Amino acid sequence: MILLDGTIVNIAIPDVLTSFQTGFSQVEWVMNAYLLAFAVLLITTGRFGDLYGRKLFFILGGLFFTLASLACGLAPTIGWLIGFRALQGLGGAMMMPNTLSIIANVFMPEERGKAMGFWGAVSGVSLALGPSLGGVLVDTASWRWIFIINVPIGILLIVLAFHFVPESTDPLSVKQIDYPGVAVLTIALFALSFALIEGQKYGWASSLILGLFTVAVVGLVLFILIQRRQVQPLMDLSLFRNRTFSVTNAVAALLMFGMMGVFFLLPVFLQAILGYSAIKAGLVMTPLAAIVIVASPLSGILSDRIGQRWLMFGGMLIAALGFYLTRRVMVMDGSWQSMVVPFVISGFGIGMVTPPSTSAVMGSVVPEKAGQASGVISSVRQIGSLLGIAVMGAVLQNRAVSYLRTGIGDKLDAAPFVLPPGAKEEILDAVASSAVNMGEMRAGGGIGASLPEGVAGSLSQMPASVAGQVADFFRDLFSMDFIMGEFAHAMRTTYLFSVIIMVVGALLATAVSARVKRTRGSGP
């Protein structure tokens, strides 16, 4: 349910934009509110489960997730939806770490591998089914049903867990909860996310955005200092002294950074720009997710034979190639057939990286540190996802505004009539303030549904002989084809950024030890 929710929501992004007639940055918060709560609380809720009962926290998490899902489906405004998504993230963070602890407690050592394999298979199926199931729900019902569908599933989960899952604790493994670390990391990541997502709106050089970047930097420094002084820190920084551990975590973060940024933008391109239905967009995206299921076990087998370094290196480069080829077919007259091969290549590369990165991290630590290492890489991956959506969204908004200002400015310079004084700058300022609001554009017919009041008044006073010419000019200037063409251009630039991220990750992977032996008892 948790993993399915992570992929099913992406396909509903364009409909959420239209439903609330909101901006792209607000929809980024729909994703990042969930990821922020999930990433920061993942390790802490796992430790609460060890202290007070894994079954208890699993059921409480299921209850939180189910109620928050219902609230998301009924949300009256985008603000309420964002808040309820954060509660969903809390529920997910309470459930996820305790699922693995419950499996480890319920199954005997000789059966544990099979149980973990089944857990992984369910995770893979959830990843593959998310886009197509989301498309069906959005087109046949409403985007709200991608959340409401969790309610009966959640109720069933709670009932089954209550009756069939035994309670277990491990209080000796937890000496204290790192509340200061949780608080400081939450503030730092929130400040960084807000600055990246809202920078285009408030201005990158504004005191608010610069202040938030400062808070993020200071917060991260304080977090490191707190971790060094805690008896049982949220993240054991001593683990990062191991080169393989630190580099592999960086590679894992970059993979999720590039992957989630791409997964977030792709449904918008398919639906808002190519005009695909949600069902069609979901089906088109399915090969990208499904091929991960094929590549992951293959990569896991190969990592035991040839080592993790070159699998991670090759996988990141293959994913970079897939993203680059996807970028080339992101054009206004693109077809779904042209996207199949790039999607398959991208999915294969992603699947090649995940198992060896997990294996390298778990094999680089002593058995006593395996639980902490697992928690660190899980949190690092979620933080990578969080920043990927924020940064890629910021790049898209910045480039979209820039390209639209340039394109519209060139057209205004070539206008067959003389514009009123100051009209060009007023129009371009209006473009800058509304270009990122794709929801209003899709619902209202374009940026130019209404000209700035002063410009409209001046144009209405122009001679009747040119009135028709003026109307035709502005109708063409603000046509949806032109606007969406510039957005497609901005998305191609954004995808190029993701290609660079994956190449950097590939280069980092070469610093991993040639073959990391999995330490006995160090986990899956």
Segments the model singles out, each with a brief description of its role:
Residues 1-38, 42, 80, 122, ...:
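Transmembrane core module of solute transporters
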Residues 26, 111-118, 369-376:
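Cytoplasmic loop-to-transmembrane helix junctions
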Residues 42, 46-181, 207-208, 304:
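Helix-loop-helix hairpins in multi-pass membrane proteins, especially solute transporters
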Residues 123, 129-131, 339-438, 510:
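Small-residue-rich alpha-helical segments with characteristic i,i+4
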Residues 159-179, 202, 225-234, 331-332, ...:
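Helix-loop junctions on the cytosolic side of multi-pass membrane transporters
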Residues 222-225, 232, 244, 359, ...:
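Transmembrane-helix exit segments and adjacent C-terminal regions of multi-pass membrane proteins
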